[in-house]
Amino acid sequence: IVITGCAVNQSSFSPSKKYSLQQVQQDYIVYQQVLEKHHPSLYWYTSKDSMDYFFNWGKEHLKDSMTETEFRKVLTYVTSKINCGHTSVRTSKAFAKFNDTIRLGRMFPLSVKVWDSAMVVTQNLNRRDSILKRGMIITSINNKSSSAIVDTMFDYISTDGYNRTHKYQTLSNRGYF
């Protein structure tokens, strides 16, 4: 007789886990040093003076008790200023695994197509919603214009040079956020 069992290991990851100021400062130092020593085109599109400004901006925005999402927001903002489409900040493996199991109520339910001055619903993940249908033009969300939302999100997306097409495509493919 063979008896087998299957146990599921409950993940100990929590997206609300807080990291100390010392932890995020140490990680930020490593992040900056790696970019400054090994990035082949750190100053192609952004001058050293400007990158120093953005690195300092990032340091100033580190605070005690940051979640991974809050820390990554600082890193993605600074990284986007390099203007290198091959340089980006990803979630930890644990966070990515958590995202694969997230419920609809905790994520933005719409897929949209974004270009110059328009944002259009391409899919609504909430099948019970009969208002936001495919093809609907979004002019604002929570009283913030779609163009203001796009401009804010652009600040966190890396791209080659000053190319905006990739940023529109990233938003249109549910990427990055």
Question: Regions from the language model: what does each represent?
Answer:
Residues 2-5:
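C-terminal motif of bacterial Sec signal peptides marking the signal peptidase cleavage site
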Residues 7-177:
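Flexible, low-complexity junctional segments that flank or bridge functional domains
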